[in-house]
């Protein structure tokens, strides 16, 4: 999209198209749906933005209240601090009228999947796009069967999805959230910053 800087455009081929794939490519997201996004990293923030473009409601989770405040400024209707609210799945159901959310953008993996299954509504969808808590763990698959939950693995996206996403970004003049831009000589510092979890959105390196 012509309105983006080089750094902003560089965030699109991986994080952005992954979020688009989750909600649009493999989903049927529509206005009025409720989406739960875990955390405030690159994919989750893009998912928040794309969901809002579609007229959906977004609930965000984070371990930091200041990040939740920024998510609300970006369009989330509610934020849940999972440190102070460990049963964030119950809170998500409360915020969605007791039925559960329509979509979960799942970044935690084995450590959070069971709670995501409790947070999502019967017939809802969980898009697994990351395993930040690790891949090993015990998850009871029975709720997936009995409540008709769709769990979909998402890994980046196709060229067709990428082109459709870019048309939507251009039409709405959407701007990716780039937290910090590091010069190439400070690449190590950039990775350390990202590893610290302090970032909100994307971290870019400019050569």
Model-derived regions, located:
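Hydrophobic/small residue at the entry helix of a nucleotide-binding pocket
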Residues: 18, 43, 111
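Glycine/charged-rich beta-loop-alpha catalytic/anionic-binding loops adjacent to active sites
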Residues: 1-6, 70, 98, 172
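C-terminal capping/lid region of NAD(P)-dependent oxidoreductase domains
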Residues: 98, 173-177, 189-207
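Adenosine-nucleotide cofactor-binding segment
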Residues: 34-40, 52-115
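Glycine-rich phosphate-binding loop and adjacent beta-alpha segment
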Residues: 54, 71-72, 107-177, 181, ...
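NAD(P)H dinucleotide-binding glycine-rich loop of Rossmann-like/cofactor-binding domains
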Residues: 1-38, 73
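Glycine-rich adenosine-cofactor-binding loop
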Residues: 39-47
